[in-house]
């Protein structure tokens, strides 16, 4: 249903490095890079994350109420991936834990301030 989600960045090289290293355990890598925008994922036929310098050249701004959500595979993987995000320069928005019955997640903001979560349902 979702082809890709785009987030803005002020530093393409830093954003590509952050997300390709962070999402590598999930099988993701930079699969297309055309300078101003790069797509990170496991294949062109799978959902992707795109990082880009805004087309209008204005500063990117994280949205209020927007969040990237990455399925981690297990609670242990949530813990590992959250820790890796922090190690790569993300800031904490909520350490891994159970948020409601059947939902376990760890929240962070990437170096550009975009909010994200690694989660496990069930």
Which residues are covered by each model-predicted region?
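Short glycine-enriched loop/turn motifs at secondary-structure junctions
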Residues: 1, 61-64, 100
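Conserved active-site tyrosine of GNAT-family acetyltransferases
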Residues: 15-19, 85, 113
């Amino acid at each position: 249903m979702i082809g890709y989600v785009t987030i803005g960045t002020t530093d393409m090289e830093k954003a590509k490095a952050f997300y390709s290293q962070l999402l590598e355990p999930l099988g993701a890598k930079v699969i297309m890079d055309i300078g101003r925008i790069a797509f990170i994922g496991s294949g062109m036929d799978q959902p992707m994350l795109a990082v880009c310098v805004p087309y209008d050249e204005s500063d990117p701004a994280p949205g209020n109420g927007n969040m990237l959500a990455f399925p981690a595979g297990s609670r242990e993987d949530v813990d590992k991936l959250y820790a890796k995000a922090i190690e790569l320069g993300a800031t904490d928005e909520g350490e891994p834990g159970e948020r409601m019955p059947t939902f376990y997640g760890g929240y962070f903001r990437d170096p550009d301030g975009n909010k994200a979560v690694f989660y496990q349902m069930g």
